Amino acid sequence: LAVDLSPYLTEKEKSAYIAGFLEEGDLMNNGELKVFPIAKSTELLYLNVTDFVPFAEATGVTYADLSTVEGLNEAAHKYYDWTDAQTAAPNDGKALYGRDALTNYLLCGAQELGTTIFDAENGVMTLRFDKPTLRKLWDNYYVPYIKGWCSASGKFRSDDIKIGSLLAYVGSSSSASFFPTQVLTSDTESHGIEMAALPCPSFAGCEPVAVQQGAGMVVIPGTEDEISACVAFLKWFTQPENNLQFSVQSGYMP
């Protein structure tokens, strides 16, 4: 069981927090705050700028091309062909990017395309599988993977960046600290790289939808003094001066 923390915060105190973060802690949609938000993240497109520049200069691909799902896949197609042409061996092009979370792509992508895949209300879940929406999601995810424009081999896509398998990946904003500073091209050779963090690509012509994910803290039942002390700590921890320091060091959103 978790304590309802809502009575321990004034309306003024609640207004200082992002409304969506507090709403996520209202597990039963009844106004109770059972999970106190402390660590929230979204998704970004991370790019190995150092190795992207030669490709961009040769093909004319720009950061703007990477702002949409379709543009990113077209750039990935060009990157595959560009790397394939650098050797005599056929069909040995490289993948440009990968994704850490398929679920986020499906949920946010469907929402951008006008379909809410599922809703949950009063303990009942409603599923919606709109065929045109799912077809577009398929064409812009699985098809590029099959063609070799996108890839996933390590546990996380930042692992693939480190060994040079990818130049970019879509992942959590909290993964910024894991982006490698060098690429290992062999057991004995490596070179330094610089990172760029770009907005997560959205479907062309659609209102962008960004995932909000993360963790919170709960307070278990205890004495009134114990509960009040826990709430005092959570308020202190999420004060701007403390929260900003935590956000900078962890990659989570303020």
Show where each model-derived region lies.
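Glycine-centered hinge/linker elements that transmit conformational signals in sensory
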Residues: 73-80, 121-154, 200
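Extracytoplasmic/periplasmic substrate-recognition and gating elements
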Residues: 31, 135, 139, 146-147, ...
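Hinge/lid segment of periplasmic solute-binding proteins
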Residues: 1-44, 53, 109-110, 190-201
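Extracytoplasmic/periplasmic solute-binding protein
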Residues: 26-43, 70-126
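Short helix-initiation/N-cap motifs at beta->coil->alpha
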Residues: 67-71, 150-163
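A ligand-binding cleft/hinge motif common to bilobed small-molecule-binding domains
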Residues: 173-190
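Paired acidic/hydrophobic, glycine-rich loop segments that form the ligand-binding mouth/hinge
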Residues: 167-172
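Short, solvent-exposed loop/beta-turn-alpha elements that line the ligand-binding surface or hinge
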Residues: 6-17, 61-67, 90, 96, ...
